């Protein structure tokens, strides 16, 4: 019977009598049980596994019924023995004792949130204790800014490169009222950043956030539709073009879906390069349906302001915006120029992140969120909301919601 041996048992009015017969067992090999008043005899066998093996399913007891051996859990199916990987009792030592411990580990693309190491020891009070956090159980949170296939930084969304490998897994696509497409950026398993203008696409300015929410469709990864629970607009969104989107459920993090890290320092410096992705219009002003990305440099802010002279420029500026639309330019924004191939972002890319790679910790961070996506290689600069300027509001909003 391989790892199985059988035990013949007689069930007598609820009392179990067993006769071990080694590897063979049959009801006929036992002496006939005496009859009793108001009761009857049932014959059964119990399969047991060899040492270091255990039953995969069922309790191993089979009753003979209608000329068939039946198990109450798995019916006519014979039991199987599998290797028992549970720990045996360790040997004792003189002048010492055994201490049991376990280690909690997170799945791929997740990490321990708590400061402990995940190791818990079973103490004399029958409690599992971690030396750092006591009885508090560890929590696993999503890894951010660590794509499995990062962008090839030697390559160079007007033009741009196709993101076929999921190199920017924080990029989401938002479809608003009247099927207007824009971008959003995943910052944890349940929250995304986008622009306030994106949230108002197809709506009048008097619309409330709760009325906007049901009109949004949001896609992450390979066109995975996720349900929006609510949107939160920045309290000063006319000057800080930002909003937050909360999902109804956490998204599973994998090689196609991963949040971008929020920065702990300012990565905005002139000529520093970063990457922007999106589903915006291409050089023919058509929506391609393919996620593309482009490498762009941070630009000089004074030159950018001069380029877009108008309502937001100093009083001595007189020229008008080259694209006929005035971007928001203030202490909360920064400008990004064209690539050396004259590539740029365009309509539909707003809400996407300007991400930079920190070589010290090999992690990608969101330095900015694209606000002004109408340059389309006609103007020289795109305009981004600086993420460090909104960090306090983002963290407070998430904590309160």
Swiss-Prot record:
Glycan-bearing residues: 286, 316
Organism superkingdom? Eukaryota
Question: What Pfam families does this protein map onto?
Answer: Trypsin (PF00089)
Signal sequence span is: 1-18
Q: Where in the cell is it found?
A: Secreted, Extracellular space
List, for all copies, the residue spans of the domain called Sushi: 28-83, 85-142
Looking at the record, which segments are called Interaction with CD163? 313-318
Q: Which GO terms describe its cellular component?
A: blood microparticle
Expression sites (tissue/organ)? Expressed by the liver and secreted in plasma.
User: Which residue pairs form cystines in this protein?
Assistant: 49-81, 106-140, 144-261, 304-335, 346-376
Q: Which GO terms of the molecular function aspect are on file? A: antioxidant activity; hemoglobin binding
For this UniProt record, the keywords arranged alphabetically read as follows:
Acute phase, Antibiotic, Antimicrobial, Antioxidant, Disulfide bond, Glycoprotein, Hemoglobin-binding, Immunity, Repeat, Secreted, Serine protease homolog, Signal, Sushi
Q: Where is the Peptidase S1 domain?
A: 157-399
Q: Which residues cross the membrane?
A: none
Q: Which GO terms describe its biological process?
A: acute-phase response; defense response to bacterium; immune system process
Function description: As a result of hemolysis, hemoglobin is found to accumulate in the kidney and is secreted in the urine. Haptoglobin captures, and combines with free plasma hemoglobin to allow hepatic recycling of heme iron and to prevent kidney damage. Haptoglobin also acts as an antioxidant, has antibacterial activity and plays a role in modulating many aspects of the acute phase response. Hemoglobin/haptoglobin complexes are rapidly cleared by the macrophage CD163 scavenger receptor expressed on the surface of liver Kupfer cells through an endocytic lysosomal degradation pathway.
Query: Whom does it interact with, and what assembly results?
Result: Tetramer of two alpha and two beta chains; disulfide-linked. The hemoglobin/haptoglobin complex is composed of a haptoglobin dimer bound to two hemoglobin alpha-beta dimers. Interacts with CD163. Interacts with ERGIC3.
Q: What is known of its domains?
A: The beta chain mediates most of the interactions with both subunits of hemoglobin, while the alpha chain forms the homodimeric interface.
Family, per entry? Belongs to the peptidase S1 family.
Q: What is this protein called?
A: Haptoglobin
- State the organism named in the record: Capra ibex (Ibex)
Underlying gene: HP
């Amino acid at each position: 019977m391989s790892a199985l041996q059988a035990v013949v048992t007689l069930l007598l009015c609820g009392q179990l009598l067993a006769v071990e017969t080694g590897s063979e067992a049959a009801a006929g090999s036992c002496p006939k049980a005496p009859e009793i008043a108001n009761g009857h005899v049932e014959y059964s066998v119990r399969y047991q596994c060899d040492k270091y093996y255990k039953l995969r399913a069922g309790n191993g007891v089979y009753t003979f019924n209608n000329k068939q051996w039946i198990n109450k859990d798995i019916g006519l199916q014979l039991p199987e023995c599998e290797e028992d990987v549970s720990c045996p009792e360790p040997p004792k030592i003189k002048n010492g004792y055994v201490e049991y411990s376990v280690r909690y580990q997170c799945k791929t693309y997740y990490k321990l949130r708590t400061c402990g190491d995940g190791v818990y020891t079973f103490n004399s009070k029958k409690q599992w204790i971690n030396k750092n956090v006591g009885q508090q159980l560890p929590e696993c949170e999503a890894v951010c800014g660590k794509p499995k296939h990062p962008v090839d930084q030697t390559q160079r969304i007007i033009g741009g490169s196709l993101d076929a490998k999921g190199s920017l897994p924080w990029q989401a696509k938002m479809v608003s009222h009247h099927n207007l497409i824009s971008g959003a950026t995943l910052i944890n398993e349940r929250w995304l950043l986008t622009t306030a203008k994106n949230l108002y696409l197809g709506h009048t300015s008097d619309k409330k956030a709760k009325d906007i929410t049901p009109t949004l469709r949001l896609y992450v990864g390979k066109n995975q539709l996720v349900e929006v629970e609510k949107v939160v607009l920045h309290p000063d969104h006319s000057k800080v073009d930002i909003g937050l989107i909360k999902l109804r459920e956490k998204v599973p993090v994998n090689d196609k879906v991963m949040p971008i890290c929020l920065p702990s320092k300012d990565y905005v410096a002139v000529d520093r390069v970063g990457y922007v992705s999106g589903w915006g219009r291409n050089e023919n002003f058509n929506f391609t349906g393919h996620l593309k990305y482009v490498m762009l440099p941070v630009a000089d802010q004074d030159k950018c302001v001069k380029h877009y002279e108008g309502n937001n420029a100093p009083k001595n500026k007189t020229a008008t915006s080259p694209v006929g639309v005035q971007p928001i330019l203030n202490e909360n924004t920064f400008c990004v120029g064209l690539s050396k191939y004259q590539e740029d972002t365009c309509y539909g890319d707003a809400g996407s992140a300007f991400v930079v790679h920190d070589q010290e910790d090999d992690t990608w961070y969101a330095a900015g969120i694209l606000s002004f996506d109408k340059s389309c290689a006609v103007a020289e600069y795109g305009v981004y909301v600086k993420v460090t300027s909104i960090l306090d509001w983002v963290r407070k909003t998430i904590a309160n919601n």
